[in-house]
């Protein structure tokens, strides 16, 4: 369960399914243009009391075997269209910046520089949107995959968002802190959970 509280008032209580459904609905309704999430430059719009900006941590290229291990590569290539590059797919890591009153909330932080030179652009993108990383007051993780939270730390190991509090759904937290989780993961994904 995710509660977004801004200026001390609960505005939105969501589970992951409801959050993703709302996001998909906004795209389908044209509130967020389909191509906005693929833009490298910040894209801003207003929704109720929120000023929302789509920022970027960069682009991420993943093999089809990671994107959808059970799908046929030719089906994925057809589905992904221009995002497909041979047997790989390119995605934009697009965290959302929400502002309301004194709250500056970042939904996800991207992958940081851990996925190569095309990632790790979140501080630069925030600055292009008129916000310094140090101004972020809350970071909310939609889920704890590396491409959503590894952008929290810089190359120096320090927080990119030194003045923020950090939030994740309780069920998500409990999953990732499960004892011996690495032994339950596929071999090629054990590195996601080993410390």
Placement of each model-derived feature along the sequence:
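N-terminal export leaders
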Residues: 15-23
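Conserved beta-strand hairpin/beta-sheet module of binuclear metal-dependent hydrolase folds
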Residues: 41-129
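Metallo-beta-lactamase
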Residues: 127, 135, 162-195
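N-terminal signal peptide c-region/cleavage motif recognized by signal peptidases
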Residues: 33-35
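N-terminal secretory signal peptides
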Residues: 1-14, 28-29
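Catalytic metal-binding/acid-base residues of hydrolase active sites
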Residues: 110-112, 145, 172
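Active-site metal-binding motif and surrounding structural segment of the metallo-beta-lactamase
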Residues: 95, 117-167
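Short, solvent-exposed loop/turn and secondary-structure capping segments
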Residues: 65, 151-152, 178-179
């Amino acid at each position: 369960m995710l509660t977004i509280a801004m200026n001390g008032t609960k505005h939105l209580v969501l589970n992951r399914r409801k959050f993703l459904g709302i996001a998909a609905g906004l795209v389908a309704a044209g509130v967020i243009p389909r191509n906005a999430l693929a833009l490298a430059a910040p894209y801003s719009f207003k929704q109720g009391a929120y000023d929302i900006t789509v920022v970027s941590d960069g682009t991420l290229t993943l093999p089809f075997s990671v994107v959808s291990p059970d799908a046929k590569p030719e089906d994925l290539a057809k589905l992904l269209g221009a995002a497909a590059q041979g047997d790989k797919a390119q995605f934009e890591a697009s965290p959302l910046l929400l502002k309301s009153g004194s709250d500056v909330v970042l939904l996800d932080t991207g992958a940081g520089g851990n996925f190569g030179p095309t990632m790790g652009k979140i501080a630069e993108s925030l600055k292009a949107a008129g916000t310094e990383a140090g101004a972020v007051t809350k970071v909310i993780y939609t889920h704890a995959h590396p491409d959503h939270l590894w952008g929290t730390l810089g190359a120096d190991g320090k927080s990119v968002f030194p003045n923020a509090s950090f939030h994740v759904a309780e069920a998500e937290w409990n999953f990732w802190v499960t004892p011996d989780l690495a032994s339950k993961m596929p071999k090629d994904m054990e590195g996601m959970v080993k410390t």
